[in-house]
Swiss-Prot record:
GO terms for cellular component: cytoplasm; DNA-directed RNA polymerase complex. This is DNA-directed RNA polymerase subunit Rpo11. Part of the RNA polymerase complex. The gene is rpo11. It comes from the Archaea.
């Protein structure tokens, strides 16, 4: 995964998420929406073949946090949830 910044302003961040597709992009978008300071979070796949693994994101915030901070918090939340699932799974398979 690689992030290519397209545009960065005080309350706006646009970037490509290189190497990912709808699976992670949708999870990230939904997790960003859980943050009360995120006013807009969405992605698009600009071309279904040529850009299939390069979603373009746009994140806007209310100014209380930066879009970069919102992205960082969403990534951490996804990581924590995945860790919780792994711990539950490990508990199940050890029984």
């Amino acid at each position: 995964m690689k992030i290519e910044v397209i545009k960065r302003d005080k309350n706006l961040l646009e970037f490509y998420l290189v190497g990912e597709d709808h699976t992670f992009a949708n999870l990230l978008s939904e997790t960003l929406h859980e943050n009360k300071h995120v006013t807009f979070a969405a992605y698009t796949i600009e071309h279904p073949v040529l850009m299939a693994r390069k979603p373009r994101f746009r994140i806007s915030t209310d100014g209380k946090i930066t879009p970069e901070k919102a992205l960082e918090e969403a990534a951490q939340k996804i990581f924590d949830r995945a860790k919780d699932v792994l711990e539950v799974w490990e508990g199940v398979i050890k029984k």
